[in-house]
Amino acid sequence: MDYFPVFLNIKQRNCLIVGGGSVAARKAKLLLRAGAHIHVVSPTINAEFTGLLQQFSSISHNAETFRPDHLQGRVLVIAATHDRATNQAVSVAARKAGIPVNVVDNPDLCTFIMPSILDRSPIIVAVSSGGGSPVLARLLRARLEALIPAAYGRLATYAAQFRGQVRQHFSRQENRRFFWEKMLQGPFAEMVFAGKDQAAQDYLLETLNNSVDQPPIGEVYLVGAGPGDPDLLTFRAMRLMQQADVVIYDRLVAPAILDMVRQDADRIYAGKERNRHTLPQTSINNLLIKLAQEGKRVLRLKGGDPFIFGRGGEEIETLSQHQIPFQVVPGITAASGVASYAGIPLTHRDYAHSCVFVTGHLKDNTVQLDWSALARPNQTIVVYMGLLGVSELCRQLIAHGLPKTTPAAIIQQGTTPNQCVLTGTLATLPTIIQENPLKPPTLIIVGEVVKLRQRLAWFNSTSESLGNTPGYSKHP
């Protein structure tokens, strides 16, 4: 983040606006809505400012040019003049005095910037582009206007009104949170939105009085995070990610996806890197049981799909043995997502009538697979976790009958801006990888369908920096 978002309490506090035009007037209106006392410094003011002075006793005007002593006693400063020298003087003086300052349309002179605001008081939504594109921030706010009805303000007011009663009824924080999640996403909220305020209050109180303050029942959410692009998450995955109390995640979960988990959820890194598991599988299973028995909603977040080389079956088998409630949310597996973003269809009527998923993990320095079954014509082979064993993989496929010229590709960090695709053949792929070191996660695709990439590639990543090497081609 270039800026840290905060909300300031400026009620009945002295703020300074330097400038008397329409932009300064708009800023004054925002500060007035927040309850500030505003002092305006400008030789002249427009009619809009004159109206504000007549309407509000909390705004005053000094018809002078700016001087540093105007900052005395101010907690916030906004400069909105057409004179660069004046704006810079305000910025320099405010910084020297340690007072937050905003210079309109000049981020370099600001110590804070003004977001685009959606006001559903007491709910406030602020959208900022970091000063890079105020127009984009306003467009995003316009979208939020349609998504967040004005009645959300009343909903928040009721939540504040009954907060004390709910706190008194439930001794456990988890129970209070569960209660409010139920209220704010169910019939109570719908009644408020429909204007049935009395019915909403009656429903809330009845539900509260009938609720028992018992230890909550824990649950585990086994969620597939997909191959990396956050846009590929399912709606169900998003919902469960937002209500989890704790998340246990693997190395292959993209940081952008982890950022979408509820912010105050505890985070536990499980590792799952080759030969370096931060938590062994048995420890993960035991931890899931322990946390769920404590009444927590546990998000077990796995890259791709939890049931495809993800050991998800082992985890829920353990949960079932201990009678722990669980849900499973499938994710887009890497074979499907990465191949699509690489422009490689896994099946095609002219090239491949079947597709096989295998794992390429080395065991005793060999890849133990049914090579005869893999080395069949008109078949696509997708190899997970095959980077270290790629030489053995290619050698065995050739030895069992696939031509050396069989097209092959390896994709690094597929579906993300860091995606990089290297294409070659079974004979050349190991050399290509040796000359262009890649970092996991990677996926290997072998078969005639790889040839289609030259025509079907559509996803343009931003990390295409490798040079051309004889014997292979690299595409974005």
Swiss-Prot record:
GO molecular function: NAD binding; precorrin-2 dehydrogenase activity; sirohydrochlorin ferrochelatase activity; uroporphyrin-III C-methyltransferase activity
Region listing for Precorrin-2 dehydrogenase /sirohydrochlorin ferrochelatase, in residue ranges: 1-204
EC nos: 2.1.1.107, 1.3.1.76, 4.99.1.4
Residue ranges, annotated region (Uroporphyrinogen-III C-methyltransferase): 218-476
Pathway: Cofactor biosynthesis; adenosylcobalamin biosynthesis; precorrin-2 from uroporphyrinogen III: step 1/1; Cofactor biosynthesis; adenosylcobalamin biosynthesis; sirohydrochlorin from precorrin-2: step 1/1; Porphyrin-containing compound metabolism; siroheme biosynthesis; precorrin-2 from uroporphyrinogen III: step 1/1; Porphyrin-containing compound metabolism; siroheme biosynthesis; siroheme from sirohydrochlorin: step 1/1
This protein's record includes keyword Protease: no
Function field: Then it catalyzes the NAD-dependent ring dehydrogenation of precorrin-2 to yield sirohydrochlorin. Finally, it catalyzes the ferrochelation of sirohydrochlorin to yield siroheme.
Descriptive protein name: Siroheme synthase
Phylogenetic placement of the source organism: Bacteria, Pseudomonadati, Pseudomonadota, Betaproteobacteria, Nitrosomonadales
